[in-house]
Amino acid sequence: MFCFVTPLRSPKLSDNWPRICALFERTATSVFRQTVGDFRHVVVCHEPPVLTRAFDRRLEFVVKDFPLPGKSSSAPRLAPAAWPIMSDDKVNKLVAGLQRAREQNADFVMLLDADDLVSCRLVAHVLSHPEADGWFVKRGWRYRYGRRWLETLDGFNHVSSSCNVLARRWFNFAGDVEREKSADAALILQGHGQAVDAFAARGVLLRPVPFRAVVYTENGENMSILMHEHLHGDRPQHRSNSLRRLAGHCKRTMSAWSKRRVCTSALRGEFALDLSIP
C-alpha cells in the first residue's frame, strides 16, 4: 500500500481559508485519480477542510492541537516571530503523518504538499517495483493558477517538497524509536533537495521517477513564497546597467517560453488540473 502524507495549514494561518480548502481538494482529487486503488491519503491538520465533493475512507484526517503562532493585527501576513512556529507546525504534522503511515503498514510513503498535484500513474509505478528503496521526482511541472500552460521543471526535488518516496524498510522500524526518528530527520529535516544524498549515506538508493510525476503549483499560499515575501519584500532593488538588465530579461523570457506546454486534456486528466480555480 502507498501512503501520501499531507500537512494542512490551520485556518488561523491563512488569509483565505476557502482557497486553501479548494486547493487541497484539487490535490486530493489528483491522489484519488490513481490508476490503482491501493493507497491511503493521511492529512494532518488542526481542522479538516471544507470540501465540495466526497472522498472515501482512504482519505483520513488526523486532527492535532499543535501550538499556533499569532498574526499581526496590522498586516494580513504572519508576523515575523511566527515563522519558526509555522515551520515547526509543518514538521510536527509530517512526523505525525509518518507515524500514522507506520501504523497502517504502508509499503511506501510520500510527503505531498496540500496544493501540489500528483500524476495518476505514480502509485502504479511505485508499487510495481517493490524491490526499490524509494524514488525521487527529478522532473516535474510548474503551474500558476489562472494560466493555460504549464512549465517543465527540471531539478524538481530542489524546488518542491512533494518529491520523495520511501520504502517501508527504511522508515518503519517497529520498536526502534531512535531509528524511526533518524528516518524522519532524513526525510523531513534534512531538506527535500538533500534527501537523496542523506539517504545514500545510509545505504538507501532513491531512484528518479522516469516521468514528470508532480505539478508544483504557485498560488500565493505557498510557504516558500510567503517566506520570500517576508525576507525580501522590503529590500531595495539595486539598479543595474539598463542594457544588461534588458539582456537578462530577454534571456529569461526566452527560457520561460521554451519550457511552456499547453494544458492539454491529457495533462489535465493525468493531474486533475482544474483551470477554473483562480
Give the role of each language-model region.
Residues 106-117:
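Short beta-strand-to-loop acidic/aromatic patch adjacent to the donor-nucleotide binding site
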Residues 179-278:
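C-terminal catalytic/acceptor-binding lobe
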Residues 119-188:
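Conserved catalytic core of nucleotide-sugar-dependent glycosyltransferases
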Residues 45-47:
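Acidic ATP/Mg2+-coordinating residue in the GHKL
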Residues 11-22, 82-86, 178-188:
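Short, flexible/disordered intra-domain loops and linkers
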Residues 21-38:
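Short, acidic, metal-binding catalytic loop of nucleotide-sugar glycosyltransferases
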Residues 1-6, 30-31, 39-43:
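Hydrophobic targeting segments
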Residues 49-106:
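Active-site-proximal specificity loops/subdomain of glycosyltransferases
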